[in-house]
Amino acid sequence: MFKNEVAEFIYKRTYSRWMEDEGRREEWPETIERFIDFLILKNGEKIPEKTVKKIRQYMLDFAVMPSMRFLWSAGPAAEKDNTVIYNCSFAKLNCVEAFAECLHILMCGTGFGFSVEEDEVSKLPSIPEIKSGKDIARVTIDDSREGWADSVKTLMTSLYEGQNLYFD
């Protein structure tokens, strides 16, 4: 099925999901079905059955491939957060939320390009002198992609407000 052993190894290592109930990894046709099932789940009637059949056959024949990140993540991971299906993204770093979004996107495995052009960065507020002493607040970080991204937003917001935080 695969052109060589290296291609099969890469498929098994990277794209073939473990099937707990069967105690084994997916085979290529099962990976394709997982991908197709996810497409149908998200698009329903928008994709004609004739087109679905063509996609399935072309993938079985290695004539066409989706984004490999999409193939890798189709199913529960992409249902939880579709950011994981993308290869790359871009944002202008002109607000606190952009920094948190950057971390979240990177933690999903998606590349992140950004602009730090002066006309964009100048939209960020100035960082005042940090207050010291009793103004320190303790912040606990939820150990998840969302938790870490939120912590960046909390940190940057506190800096712009002149607060000093302690991250636990």
Language model feature labels by segment:
Residues 1-168:
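Extended catalytic cores of very large enzyme megasubunits
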